[in-house]
Amino acid sequence: MAVVRIQSFVLLGLMTLTTLVHAQVPDAGALQQQLQKQVPSNQSLPKPQAPVKKSKPDEAKPGEVKVTIKGFRVDGNKSVPEEAIQQTLKPWLGKTVPFQELQKAADAVAALYQAYGKLAQVSVPPQRITDGVVVLKVLEAKLGAVNIDMPNGPSRFSEERARRYITDANRLSEIIQTQNIERSIYILNETPGVAVTTQLEPGKNEGEVDLRVSLADTKPYRGKVEGNNYGSRSTGVMQRVVNVTFDNPGSYGDQLSFSNIKSLGSDYSQASYSLPIDTDGWRLGVAASYLDYQNVGKFAYPTSSVAGFGYAKTVGLNLSYPVLRSPGANTNFTAGADRKLYANKNAADGTYTSDYRIENMVLGLSGNQFDSWNGGGVNSGSITLTKGHIVVGGGRSDYDSTIPKTFTKYNLSLSRNQQVVPDETILTISASGQFASVDLDSAEKFYLGGPNGVRAYPGSQGAGSQGAMVNIEVQQQLQDKVVATAFFDAGLVQQYKDKALYQANKGSTNANNSYILKGVGAGLKRADKDIIWSASIAWKLGSNPLYTAQGVGVNNDKRSNSAYLWAQVQWTF
């Protein structure tokens, strides 16, 4: 159900309308969803860089002799179609060139091997060219050895374990598959607590190439302390955020994270742990969270007769796998199972307004792609399928009988990060949406408002079972450490899938079943060595679709603000 306006005392007295009570003030499910967005994700996609520095073959020494080329003979080729090689060499046919130009033809064949995922040295051997046919010699590279260096001293991640990340997917003495080598290096470099650089070198035997890996530890821990005003007004706007991550504490690529977000009336904690289960990138993780909240200020009892308190508990398992790793693109697969318990109580007498749990199965794909179009940019996207089941507890067995107990929902996101002026101006366009099979509980709904959504409205504003949102932002570098932003946000939400349910609850919001929130704004961000400051202000566009019986637009924080200011200061360590 969407966020409602504060109505008259008559509406406040309608305690039998459970959905209305939940709509007036964000409950445990709505609060938890907003807080989760502020916790850093440890499953984000990497920004890959060229993983292997390839040695350039020695060029033939220039001479005075020129050669008229009538054809090429390529010796030693086993892995690339001959037709593809001859097509690559076609630009040199019929030309009279100096001898050093022949090495450029050889380099073109080596590049063709790279395109086929192979590594080869292509040279122009000493020869007497009498009939215009040039001989090129191909030496297809085999992996001779994987040598591990530790320039900074012994690593917490063992030498043998690091070597296995390479050799499990790239057998020694076999022809090198460059995509396999690159993938192995990316996965090793993404392992928490591990940093590697690599170099291909000539091997001991002809045709062999050795991979030298420099292995070093990253910091054993990292984190941040943050202050912001991102909280819900019903539980306290000002928040203190602490996040600490321990990389590789067990010396086998594991990761342990703790987060806490505290305001005047809420305390949210989350812990997660993950570890690799093979050398191909599979990771298994567990996570748990706990939220305790009570309404404060004008939302507290006895000022508000619908004031409440409650909690949310979650525990879950997750599995992730890097489907694709390459210099230009990445794809991740995730799967998970969650159990979430919610309880909301009335502050006046302590009776339950809701008591239930949600059991979810989740599958997801996410990816990004790097390109050089118009100065370069990044495309990112994700899709998530959630199948869930609601089990009502004993505290309030009649909780919201209008909400179906099984559901399916899809969440999608797309974004483009485009350099308009390199290193100065960046344009970001992002879109997200949710599609549901039935009406959803507050913990599973789509929300438009808040600092991560339509910034002209408060968090948890614009709730619905289905919705979509677009955010457009321009970032302009003003000086070394300061960035200015200008943005436009817009979102569409459908409160109810069931039209009969909408008609029954229409009076709680006076809004159409589907409505739009939109706004514009500007901001500043300064990044010093360890401290990041940011502030933005957003103004709503158009009238507020949620309004009182008197026609006054009002948000779920009991305000009629035409603008919202968001501020954040963050210290990283």
Question: What name fits each language-model region?
Answer:
Residues 240-244, 267-271, 313-317, 359-365, ...:
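Hydrophobic, lipid-facing positions within transmembrane beta-strands of outer-membrane proteins
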Residues 24-231, 259-268, 430-433:
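Periplasmic polypeptide-binding modules associated with outer-membrane biogenesis and secretion
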Residues 244, 524-532, 557-573:
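Outer-membrane beta-barrel "beta-signal"
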Residues 246-250, 272-279, 292, 318-326, ...:
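Outer-membrane beta-barrel proteins
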Residues 223-225, 254-258, 282-286, 331-335, ...:
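Transmembrane beta-strands of outer-membrane beta-barrel proteins
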Residues 222-231, 242, 246, 252-263, ...:
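Transmembrane beta-strand segments that form the barrel wall of outer-membrane beta-barrel proteins
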Residues 345-509:
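C-terminal outer-membrane beta-barrel translocator/porin domains of Gram-negative envelope proteins
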